[in-house]
């Protein structure tokens, strides 16, 4: 259960392309008490991504070393790349009494849930439909046809995990979905 005396840890998860990263950025821009957890990854940076801001881009060898050192709260292999949230980055955020915003998949959320000391509120974001998700993936122009096909195959496996979340929202309109998330934040922070 949520503890209003500890920093809130808001988890946003969704199938790839449903809008969790866009929503995460909107939350951070609208509420400076939130800091986005910057994950480590072994994938190559996309255009306009900045190391240390969007992700900590590391080699597979470095990632495996961090795993052996038990440096992560959560980690997963997704589409052949590793992702993980380091304990040190979360501790740095909460030390400043800021709330933490996680932009992670269901596997990461499941692993975070094992740490009872974390003040988690979990929100699963759905696209309006599978067809709309495919349109979004094509429109964002970040993946080739094969990658989009893999993401669409993963969609059905991803959405079964929505039952493990505190809230499930449909992102049919970014502003409406964002306002719903703000309502959830207000409820759990008891801010007006």
Label the predicted regions.
Residues 21:
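Walker A/P-loop
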């Amino acid at each position: 259960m949520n503890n209003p005396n500890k920093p809130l840890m808001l988890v946003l998860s969704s199938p790839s392309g449903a809008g969790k990263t866009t929503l995460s950025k909107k939350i951070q821009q609208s509420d400076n008490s939130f800091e986005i957890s910057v994950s480590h990854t072994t994938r190559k940076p996309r255009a306009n991504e900045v190391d240390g801001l969007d992700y900590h881009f590391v080699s597979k060898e470095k990632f495996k070393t961090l795993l052996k050192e038990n440096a992560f709260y959560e980690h997963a292999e997704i589409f052949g790349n590793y992702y993980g949230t380091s304990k040190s980055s979360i501790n740095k955020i909460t030390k400043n009494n800021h709330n933490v915003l996680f932009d992670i998949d269901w596997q990461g959320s499941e692993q975070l849930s094992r740490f009872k000391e974390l003040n988690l509120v979990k929100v699963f974001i759905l696209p309006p439909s599978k067809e709309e998700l495919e349109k979004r993936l094509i429109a964002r122009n970040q993946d080739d046809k094969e990658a989009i096909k893999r993401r669409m195959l993963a969609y059905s496996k991803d959405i079964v995990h929505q039952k493990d979340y505190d809230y499930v929202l449909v992102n049919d309109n970014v502003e409406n979905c964002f306002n719903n998330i703000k309502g959830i934040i207000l409820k759990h922070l008891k801010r007006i």
